[in-house]
């Protein structure tokens, strides 16, 4: 640099400023893409949560319907005058360990009544802006002190804000996944229990028809 003329030094400064400006533009573009991906992920998790809730409600309704079906089968046995030996009576399905583990006893501590910790929703891309900002004096050391450096400062300020948003989104995504995993297992257990209950009811109905 000592061998460069003042004009060459100025040209070099402008070249570095142009390169730095393009770098901040690329960084900002990548940050915006990451934020958009995070928003889409949160939206998809929210939609998945609604679907899981509907599935679980459907399984709960099947469970209730099966309870009524079993009562009907018991009444039909009585109406048909079938005498069942006490040792051959069908055991109440809801007294079984598998049922109690899945549905509990209907009290406040039953699996169905346990509410997992839910993160605060982020909808329509509206994210809280972080309170942290640029360090005192700005992000860059000004050399040319022109509009390019103004844009660089603005770009880096936006990047800092987006990084704060990404941190919040990562926490929300992690919390939502942690909340949904137990529900997915609960749904699987309920589906398995309902299947077993339906199989037993079908066997009772077939036996009743064949009698």
Curated annotation (Swiss-Prot):
Specify the superkingdom.
Eukaryota
User: Which is an annotated Pfam family here?
Assistant: SNAP-25
Keywords on record: Acetylation, Cell membrane, Coiled coil, Lipoprotein, Membrane, Palmitate, Phosphoprotein, Protein transport, Repeat, Synapse, Synaptosome, Transport
Answer whether the UniProt record assigns the keyword Phosphoprotein to this protein: yes
Q: Which residues carry this modification: Phosphoserine?
A: 5-6, 20, 23, 34, 110, 161
> Do the record's keywords include Repeat?
yes
**How does it sit in the bilayer?**
Peripheral membrane protein; Lipid-anchor
Q: Where is the lipid attached (S-palmitoyl cysteine)?
A: 79-80, 83, 85, 87, 112
Q: Which GO terms describe its biological process?
A: exocytosis; histamine secretion by mast cell; membrane fusion; post-Golgi vesicle-mediated transport; protein transport; synaptic vesicle fusion to presynaptic active zone membrane; synaptic vesicle priming; vesicle targeting
Q: Which residues carry this modification: N-acetylmethionine?
A: 1
Q: How does it assemble?
A: Homotetramer (via coiled-coil domain), also forms heterotetramers with STX4 and VAMP3. Found in a complex with VAMP8 and STX1A. Found in a complex with VAMP8 and STX4 in pancreas. Interacts simultaneously with SNAPIN and SYN4. Interacts with STX1A. Interacts with STX12. Interacts tightly to multiple syntaxins and synaptobrevins/VAMPs. Interacts with ZDHHC13 (via ANK repeats). Interacts with ZDHHC17 (via ANK repeats).
Task: Write out the similarity annotation.
Answer: Belongs to the SNAP-25 family.
Q: What does this protein do?
A: Essential component of the high affinity receptor for the general membrane fusion machinery and an important regulator of transport vesicle docking and fusion.
The identity of this protein, by name, is: Synaptosomal-associated protein 23
Q: What is the lineage of its organism?
A: Eukaryota, Metazoa, Chordata, Craniata, Vertebrata
């Amino acid at each position: 640099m000592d061998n460069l003329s003042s004009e060459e030094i100025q040209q070099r400064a402008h070249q570095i400023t142009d390169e730095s400006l393009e770098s901040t533009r690329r960084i900002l573009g990548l940050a915006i893409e990451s934020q958009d991906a995070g928003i889409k992920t949160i939206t998809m998790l929210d939609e998945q949560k609604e679907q899981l809730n509907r599935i679980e409600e459907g399984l709960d309704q099947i469970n209730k319907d099966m309870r009524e079906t079993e009562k009907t089968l018991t009444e039909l046995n009585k109406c048909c005058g079938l005498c069942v030996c006490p040792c051959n009576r069908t055991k109440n399905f809801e007294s079984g360990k598998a049922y109690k583990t899945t549905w509990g006893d209907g009290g406040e501590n039953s699996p169905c009544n346990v509410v997992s910790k839910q993160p605060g929703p982020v909808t329509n891309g509206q994210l809280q802006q972080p309170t942290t900002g640029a360090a005192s004096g700005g992000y860059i050391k000004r050399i040319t002190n022109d509009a390019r450096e103004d844009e660089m400062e603005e770009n880096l300020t936006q990047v800092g804000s987006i990084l704060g948003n990404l941190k919040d989104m990562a926490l929300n995504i992690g919390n939502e996944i942690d909340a949904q995993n137990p529900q997915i297992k609960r749904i699987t257990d309920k589906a398995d229990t309902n299947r077993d209950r339906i199989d037993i009811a079908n066997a009772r109905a077939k036996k009743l028809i064949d009698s």
